[in-house]
Amino acid sequence: MAFSIQSIFSNIFSGLSADFKKKNFSLYGQWVGIISILLCLALGVANIFHASIVIVFSIICIVQGLVVTLVEMPFLLKICPFTETFTNFIKNFDANWPRCGFYLLNAAIQWVSIAVMATSLIVVACFFTVAGGCYALAAITHQEYLKSSIQVTGSPDSVEGQIGQHVVRNVL
């Protein structure tokens, strides 16, 4: 019993619109962070072919993308075997202020890359800055830290959702 692509995209976009209707900056930060993951991986690989010290920042960018993936999608910590120390380190970012600091530190690292050469890594720095700003606004306005409400497998009441959750439970 396979999921249709249409139902998956329908669930994603309905969850996305529900998240934006909540007007919570931590959700905005999470979505900007997810976009940052894609940008980190794509632009990190694209800039790795420079014949200068930019290669170092490209490698850092790829690593940042992988770490942000684990921060924004913590279920991957259960799937992938990591040390307890690393897992606890990632779990420290389950609040607005720590995530704000995490993203702003990542942004600062990528902003430093401009000193070497202006490359497309500036886009990653901008997105990290925006994500950090969203988490900072959430913390300043005392909004609670929320996670996205997207259910890729469907709502728990639907047959697809129940099957999807059962499959995920069996995998974990």
Swiss-Prot record:
Q: Does the keyword Lyase apply?
A: no
Please give, as recorded in its UniProt entry, the membrane topology of this protein. Multi-pass membrane protein
Provide a GO CC annotation, any one. Answer: Golgi membrane
InterPro entries reported in the protein's UniProt record = TVP18/Ca-channel_flower
Q: List, in alphabetical order, the GO biological process terms annotated in this UniProt record.
A: vesicle-mediated transport
- List the keywords (alphabetical): Glycoprotein, Golgi apparatus, Membrane, Transmembrane, Transmembrane helix
Q: Which Pfam families match?
A: Cg6151-P
Localization, per the record, is: Golgi apparatus membrane
Family matches, as SMART domains: Cg6151-P (SM01077)
State the superkingdom.
Answer: Eukaryota
* Bilayer-crossing regions: 25-45, 48-68, 100-116, 123-140
- Positions of glycan attachment: N24
Chief site of localization = Golgi
Q: Is Glycoprotein among the key words of this record?
A: yes
Q: Which family does it belong to?
A: Belongs to the TVP18 family.
Task of the protein:
Golgi membrane protein involved in vesicular trafficking.
Q: What is this protein called?
A: Golgi apparatus membrane protein TVP18
